[in-house]
Regions:
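N-terminal hydrophobic targeting/anchoring segments and the immediately downstream early-domain regions
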Residues: 1-125, 177-181, 186-288
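Loop-centered beta-sheet repeat module
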Residues: 126-161
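Short hydrophobic/aromatic-enriched beta-strand-loop microsegments
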Residues: 168-174
Length: 288
């Protein structure tokens, strides 16, 4: 992070990681149904790991907008506690409160494992979108102060979440469906349509474009594609760094992104919004 001039990164706890793997088609998926309590136990262990990482590496933990601003001003790497998939809830909203007390401020509702919140893009349709429990989860997230992330959610689930949301939503890592800049990709199911993206923008939120592109310049083109659909106030970077290294192999290379955006035609103000300003605005509105 220091080498890449990154002030803040979302450090994801992935509760369904113990049951994920490649299926016979080579696609990442849940390979079995988790045992009761298994993903909750794993989630708690990952929160312990984050605590140790923060202490051992001298990182800051950002739990408020003021913390993000201080991290940027000081140039000291900070992390936002993030959970990628609320599979560990198992119908228990009090576990959200526990996660908040442990420093988590960013939650993604679904991932690769069926849960009781809603449908995900790479799985079968079982809920026809957002469930009644999912509605309660969104309301609780707003009350507690979490960034609400609808990455991996189906278009139907996303549009139903938009109707419930009273704060900006984030879709943290994707690309525009049929992106010419990305070209042929095994990630087609994870791309989003123009209507899908516009629904997020209507909440005041943003769509994060991951960097799974052939080159850095193509990545900038991918950012432009989404800006053309929803406007520069509703686009941000979304790394999924360990899973999709793409055009930027590690965090140290992110120092080159802003220069590439300027070279590609973005103004300094526009580049600032995409590189962090839009996420900061959403974080402030959601977390405080």
């Amino acid at each position: 992070m220091r080498a890449g001039s990154l002030a803040v990164a979302c450090l994801a706890d992935v509760p369904d990681a113990p049951i994920l793997g490649r299926n016979t088609a080579g696609v990442l998926a849940a390979l079995r149904t988790p045992d009761p309590g298994q993903l909750y136990k794993y989630h708690l262990g990952r929160l312990d790991w984050v605590d140790e990482l923060v202490t051992s590496h001298g990182l800051r933990r950002a739990t408020s907008a003021a913390d993000l601003e201080a991290a940027h001003a000081a140039g000291q790497p900070s992390i936002v506690g993030d959970v990628e998939g609320l599979d560990f809830l198992e119908g228990k909203l009090e576990r959200l409160e526990e996660a908040h007390s442990r420093g988590v401020r960013h939650v993604q509702f679904v991932h690769y494992t069926p849960n009781d919140i809603g449908d995900f893009q790479t799985g079968g349709i079982t809920h026809q979108g957002l469930t009644s429990f999912g509605v309660e989860v969104i309301q609780a997230c707003h009350r507690l102060g979490f960034v609400c992330d609808v990455a991996h959610a189906t278009e139907d689930m996303t549009k139903q979440a938009v109707k419930v949301a009273t704060k900006p939503l984030l879709l943290s890592h994707t690309a525009l469906s049929g992106s010419p800049a990305m070209g042929p990709t095994p990630l087609t199911e994870r791309q989003v349509s123009r209507d899908h993206a516009r629904a997020i923008a209507e909440t005041g939120g943003a769509i994060g474009i991951w960097h799974f592109f052939p080159s850095l310049d193509k990545y900038v083109d991918g950012l432009k594609e989404m800006v053309d659909v929803v406007g520069v106030d509703h686009v941000c970077v979304g790394t999924d760094q360990q899973v999709a290294p793409g055009s930027l192999q590690n965090y140290s290379q992110w120092v080159h992104l802003v220069a590439a955006m300027l070279r590609g035609g973005f103004s300094p103000e526009e580049a600032g919004k995409i590189a962090g300003g839009n996420y900061m605005r959403i974080f402030r509105a959601a977390v405080g």
